[in-house]
Amino acid sequence: VIGGVDSLEVGRFNELTSEEDEFSRRLARNQQIILKEESHFDKVVDPAGGSYYIENLTQELANQAWKYMQELEAEGGILNALQEGKIHTDIEKVANARKEAMRKRKDVYVGINLYANPDENPPTQIQIPRESNPIKMEVLKAGALPQLRVVEEIENLRTRVIKSDKNRNIFLMNMGTINDYRVRADFATGFFQAGGFTVISPQGFMTVEDAVKSAKESNAAAYCICSTDEKYNELVPAICSALPDSFLILAGYPKDKVESFKENGIKMFIYMGADVVATLDELAKKLGVENEA
């Protein structure tokens, strides 16, 4: 609307999980109508005029699009690019980069790879019949352009874990004062909840004995130690010795201690920049969650 488009299609919020209904269709439609009819964006020649943010991004988008079109023309045009698979390859490169950013949480998708709702039930996806186009195009020999959703991997993992009948409780062994464990406990909670795991986060423990006792009583499938790097030097060997047969995770990645901590019995590390999908998928498999729920 702000850009002056002649037509616009906005997807329904539930288009992946249900057939079209009046409520979702109305919401998708009315967002743009409100901008036009109530905010009167269509009455102004250039609503975004003077906005460096919008104008700069618009110019950058136009420049990159024009550069890409020239590149396609130099290689024989868009039809040839489709037939040769160039466009498919370019889309795959962008998709892989976006997936990598999502997996390492450089790109945040609220409610999915960060701040996931632990009480949310996964929606039931349905197969919605679509009308097929009888027109056969020569270009389709190259294969259809893929429809990709960046968060699909982690959504599938989360659904798999939630639907599984395996124990998915993770007990946080918060050690020391609240200043010692709070940051990493919050990080660990968000990390595990993104994969559908249930987090048990008690108050801090001042002794290893108390932490081990509570951990055993929690009946959790795995335990995650949360504290400072300095305290880990004493805590990790002691906790690993007290829980030799347990799946122990460490919140953090002290590079100079990783190998020795592994020897002590730490099975997994979670930290900023870790691949959340790969890490949680490995955890799910270790806990017995099957690939297909």
Where do the model's predicted regions map?
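Generic beta-strand/beta-sheet core signal
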Residues: 2, 8-13, 75, 82, ...
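Phosphate/diphosphate-binding loops
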Residues: 11, 43, 54, 62-86, ...
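Short glycine/threonine-rich loop-to-helix capping motif typified by GTGT followed
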Residues: 18-28, 53-68, 87-102, 180-186, ...
